[in-house]
UniProtKB/Swiss-Prot annotation:
ANK repeats: 118-147, 148-177, 179-207, 208-237, 238-267
Natural source organism: Acanthamoeba polyphaga mimivirus (APMV)
Keyword Repeat set for record: yes
Keywords, comma-separated and alphabetical: ANK repeat, Repeat
Keyword Electron transport recorded: no
Cited InterPro entries: Ankyrin_rpt, Ankyrin_rpt-contain_sf
N-terminal signal peptide: none
Classification via PANTHER family: ANKYRIN REPEAT PROTEIN, GH09064P
Record-given protein name: Putative ankyrin repeat protein L23
């Protein structure tokens, strides 16, 4: 067995493309795909070097150590044309670590992972998924929460992770980045607590022609709609777009409420 360590990210069931991974030796049952021009195809068990692992964060929640059974005469391996991963017909899965745990990230750093790689994707990923302790650890190592137009706080808001949002704001994240993206998409997903907090921090609910209330109406979030109206949102913006979207999506309670507030159901696009 090779002592060189590689990494792989697995989901909660550790099943990818119909292959159920297990601790120890994993052997591909189908024919190995050794076509040098093929990428991301069946017929390979994929893994990567530590320096590339952050490209694959969205594949799951576990970090697996990967070793290669190079002493097995049937072992086959190919470098993917993308250049940042490999495929083999058999791999050995070592220890499993949870990416939601800061200790996993400490381990990754010890193996040479650059937490700022991929335009600071690690802190954006942790923010998007609500892993506050991981966010805090990454920031302590110099992660830039303002990378990519303050995408970390935008994603945390969009997904309703209020504790992460508050922490990022304490680190000077700009909640108004990208035309108040944060409050618009928190409204879209019905995260009332986040919407209220963002407003308390200066978010503009009327940005982009009252887009927040239009999104809240479209996706059926009555309490958000009521809150936005209480702050002066214009329910008739863009030719009564809010009531039209609520109607198109079958949100009768919102339709009735908007009508009670003066929406014109006969307005045209």
């Amino acid at each position: 067995m090779s002592q060189k360590i590689y990494f792989k990210i697995t989901n909660d069931k550790e099943c990818h493309n119909g292959f159920q991974y297990k601790d120890g030796l994993n052997i591909l049952q189908e024919k190995f795909n050794d076509n040098l021009e093929d990428s991301c195809v069946p017929g390979r068990l994929y893994f990567t070097k530590p320096k590339h692992i952050l490209k694959y964060l969205d594949y799951g929640i576990y970090l697996r150590e990967i070793y290669l059974p190079t002493d097995n005469p049937d072992f086959k391996m190919i470098r993917d044309p993308t250049g940042d991963k490999y495929g083999a017909n058999m791999i050995i899965l070592g220890e499993r670590r949870d990416l939601r745990n800061p200790d996993t990230w400490k381990y990754m750093v010890s193996k040479g992972v650059d937490i700022r790689a991929e335009d600071d994707y690690a802190v954006k990923w942790a923010s998007k998924n609500g892993h506050l302790k991981v966010v805090e650890y990454l920031v302590s190592l110099g992660a830039d929460i303002k990378s990519d137009g303050d995408y970390a706080v935008r994603w945390a808001s969009e997904n309703g992770h209020i504790d992460v949002v508050k922490y990022l704001v304490s680190q000077n994240a700009d909640i108004r980045a990208d035309n108040d993206y944060a409050v618009k998409w928190a409204s879209s997903n019905g995260h009332l607590e986040v919407v209220k907090y963002l407003v308390s921090q200066g978010a503009n609910i009327r940005e982009q022609n009252d887009y927040a209330i239009r999104l809240a109406s479209q996706y059926g979030h009555l309490e958000v709609v009521k809150y936005l109206i209480s702050l002066g949102a214009d329910i008739r913006a863009d030719n009564d777009c809010a009531v039209r979207l609520a109607s198109e999506n079958g949100h009768i309670e919102i339709v009735n409420y908007l009508i009670s507030q003066g929406a014109d159901i006969r307005a045209k696009k």
